Amino acid sequence: MKVCNLVEAYIAYRRSLGERYQSPAVMLRSFARYIGEDKECMSIDEKTCTAFLYSPNNTVSASWFLRYSSLKWMFEWAIVRGYMQEVVLPKEKPKALEHVKPYIYSAEELKRIFELALSYQKNKSKTPPRCVQAILKLTYVLGLRISEPISLQLKDLNLCEKYLVIRESKFYKSRMVPFNDQVVLLLNDFLGWRKAQGWSSDNETFVFLDKNMDRLSIDVVRNAFERIREMAGIKRTDGSRYQPRLHDLRHSFAVHRLTEWYRSGKDVNRLLNSLSTYLGHDHISNTSVYLSMTDDLLSEANNLFNAYRNGKVET
């Protein structure tokens, strides 16, 4: 059996089990192209697989482990069916990457990011700065994953009822995200600009487009954000190998919200479940990690605990 046929058969098998199997499918097809789609499965060797795992820069990245596990499962599936004889992968795996500690942006840093989003481009581009700015603002003020604003269609916005719909995001769940009057103003302002560009108002049209009328991609927005962050002079000083990321806007939203609740004397433990639902987490434990993420948050939590202990806050 040829590699391309093995990959497609395995993807079909995983999807027949009810799985979406999207990211691994992209990776496996990339593997087939890398080693040659017409290559016979029996001739796949460990050296070639190892080179693929470390490509393109011969380094260990987060994708290394996804590639390894996906290939391992496919090879084991192929062995049972007689398409291969062994798992041709390195016996030892590299040390797991250090956990990326989220960077929590300050109010001043957020202001610089949003302002520079309109002026970061040095040359003409098909990416409208107004779209980039609106995406970054929505990502922060609503605590979204970057894939979520990019995937929004006009039908997903309900400004009258003040909510938007996130359709089948992470964990394949849809959810409604309510917002306040400030977000209504933000969206109305952007949609007014969008209309002035003569873009389609069909409900199925994506909200954020480039000048070719194509949906903006995650990579385009991520690259734009990196330029904006560098122009804003925002960088880590804690020795971490990773600089502040686009996804940290979402983490900043969560931490800022929790800090605000503590400072106003709210019952954070009770509200944590609501925040978890709002963020689209599949388990509250994924949200509770924010409780110890910054010194400010820990300080506010300690102050509230002391107030309860001394009887200054009613229960």
Region locations from a protein language model:
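Conserved catalytic core of the tyrosine transesterase superfamily
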Residues: 1-315
